[in-house]
Amino acid sequence: MKVTTIFIIGLLLPLLGTMIGSAFVFMMKNEMSARLQKSLLGFASGVMVAASVWSLLIPAMEMKANSGAWSVVPAAVGFLLGIGFLLLIDELTPHLHIGTDKPEGLRSHLSKTAMLALAVTIHNLPEGMAVGVVFAGAENGAAHISLAAAISVSLGIAIQNIPEGAIISMPMRAAGNSRWKSFMLGSLSGVVEPIGALAVILLASLLMPALPYMLAFAAGAMFYVVVEELIPEASSGQHSNLSTIGFAIGFVLMMVLDVVMG
């Protein structure tokens, strides 16, 4: 298979995962149970944390290994910038998380559906950045980042997006939308990922010396989403132990993917 074809497939895999998850509205009649939702939120958190550590932060430090103890600086700086960037977007963008009625960000007159879409966009942007930056490293021959490793990140994000797609589309169906509309809205939430990935690839190709910072930046952005959104939702109320089990499974799965394919 040509490298270009592999790149295209790798960039589209996360979107495919979101679409598969969104299609759950055609297979499930009732609203998603609290137990299943907690488990899936924990699983998604585990995949994102493992991808951030094994596929982003560690390669960022390994690329600067010749700097000795200072190799941690790009990873630390990029990580903090990634968290700060998402924090700024979170504060400025009006959005509404699924399962809540209290908007966040700047006040606006946007509809509930529009604010839900913005919340999902904020959530998915770091995942697209993560896929884009590892593919950029593989494309430009960066040390410690192979094409197989990039595919493993894309595959891991795609697997994680399956429950996310369901978590988005099922509540929309329960709110009274048709199955097709719920599926389309859930699927569209994943479009930002290949777009974000392409943007990062183009930027990284121009700024290869900054690649370690960009890897850590994507990791920081993903950690922000996990700590700010996923973990609070997964740990609130009953059945939080299921989210812990889901987290462990997701983390180990992504770790294995990175080691085996990387």
Question: What function would you assign to each model-found segment?
Answer:
Residues M1-G262:
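Intrinsically disordered, metal-sensing/regulatory segments
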